[in-house]
Regions:
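Transmembrane alpha-helices and adjacent helix-loop boundaries
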Residues: 1-152
Length: 152
């Protein structure tokens, strides 16, 4: 029982010294997660919908070219940002971009860099979720929607 008293006493002392810092850290984490996740959801929704716009041989060559180009860019974005750890993305964006662009692109605020990193990472994951959801719609449902005048 004496060990538990010592542990609880130590936790109490730590809370007295660092309690406000813990609360501020929790607040910052919740703000970052909320803002960046909402931005990432918007990025993912846009990428997922753009990646599933249908086209065929009868469409204009310019439309087909741009839709293919958009799909390639989105697929590269998704593969790169889903395939690399978020810490690596953060280090590259915060330290690598200023180095490689001779300080032309530099984050002056750590919050902006953090929101950008979490947003683009979340956007890549959400893009695949949206794309998968749209593709999984039964063809009969799509035909029914077109029959009543809905578009993609």
């Amino acid at each position: 029982m004496g060990d538990w008293n010592k542990i609880l006493t130590d936790i109490g002392r730590l809370w007295d010294v660092y309690g406000q810092a813990y609360l501020k850290g929790i607040q910052n984490t919740l703000i970052l997660a909320t803002v960046a996740t909402l931005a990432g959801c918007l990025i993912g929704l846009l990428c997922g919908v753009l990646n599933t716009i249908p086209y065929n041989k009868n469409d204009n060559i310019v439309k087909r070219f741009f839709l293919r180009l958009i799909r390639i860019v989105i697929q590269v974005y998704v593969e790169v940002f889903r395939g690399t750890p978020m810490v690596l993305q953060a280090v590259f964006l915060y330290y690598g971009l200023p180095y490689f662009t001779d300080n032309a692109v530099k984050f002056t605020n750590i919050w902006v860099a953090a929101i950008v990193v979490v947003s683009i990472n979340t956007g890549a994951y959400m893009a695949e979720s949206v794309r998968g959801g749209i593709i999984s719609i039964d063809p009969g449902q799509t035909e029914g929607a077109k029959a009543i005048g809905m578009t993609h």
